[in-house]
Amino acid sequence: NERLKRTLISSVGKLESIKRIADNEVSAMGERLRMLILTDYIKKENLAKIASAEEFNSVNIVSIFETIRRANLNVNIGVLSGSLVILPKAIDLSDVKHKKEDIANTDYCTVEFTGALHRGVDYVGKLFEEGKIQILIGTKSLLGEGWDSPCINSLILASFVGSFVLSNQMRGRAIRIDKNDPEKSANIWHLVTVEPEYLFKYKATERIYAYIKEDYKELHSYDYDILKRRFDSFMGPNYTMGTIESGIERITLIKPPYDKNGIERINEEMLKLSADRGEVKNKWRGEVADGSFA
């Protein structure tokens, strides 16, 4: 049913995936990392959970921020949205009108910029481009506020609602050419919740049968079904052949078995490949030059 689908799509387990990706990207890029994480909701009421032992039950700006902060990745994190801005206390804000409030027991503070919204958006964007923030978390509404930054070299799409056009717009944030870094290569991360088939059965007898006859050759995921449709219009190198193709089939690492160990294998291989940005650039350059499109 639709309620179950929404629950799976916004699975809190994705917070662990975001942390794992961030850790991997920090290890690969260090201070050169410019990671943007886009999501749907802010949830300011969760600010009270920061620097506490409380767990989160949904994916939103605050839960993503705190999950990464607790991981102690030795990077500066920022939050940018229409109603919530979080910045490291160490950043000098003396050249801009603002109000700020420290977040207890952390190195961060909430900031309220005085004046038009776009001024704060532009200011935080500049901090990001200058490397004073390595990981920036925001809502997809940023796309409608005139914010753009070609320095993005890692994008996590933790946004679970919206149209195909919006998905393309978000991807476009990462693939822009950066005149300050002509050799830039960006990773774009899509999060997928995979669940057993029996969860999608309506009758108890159907659920029991699906549980007993669990088939790990098939990938059961509402998330993945959406992603497959979107990948039909995304071009990229085939992971095995190297030719530039559309469709999710080009990501040849995604193969059965789709049990817990199989999914972990896929994730490990994805993380390993993502760290080699040079190889990604080589595949694009070689195949585009040769005209090897499929």
Residue ranges and their predicted role:
Residues 205-294:
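Long, largely alpha-helical accessory region at the distal end of helicase-like NTP-driven motors
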Residues 84-89, 196-199, 249-254:
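A short acidic, often aromatic-flanked loop/helix-cap motif at beta-alpha or helix-coil junctions
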Residues 80-82, 191, 244-247:
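Conserved beta-strand termini and adjacent loop/short-helix elements that scaffold enzyme active sites
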Residues 167-169, 173-224:
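Conserved segment of the helicase C-terminal RecA-like domain
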Residues 64, 151, 166-173, 226-230:
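Alpha-helical scaffold elements adjacent to nucleotide-binding pockets in ATP/GTP-utilizing enzyme cores
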Residues 42-44, 84-85, 142-144, 161-163, ...:
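Conserved nucleotide-binding/hydrolysis micro-motifs of P-loop NTPases
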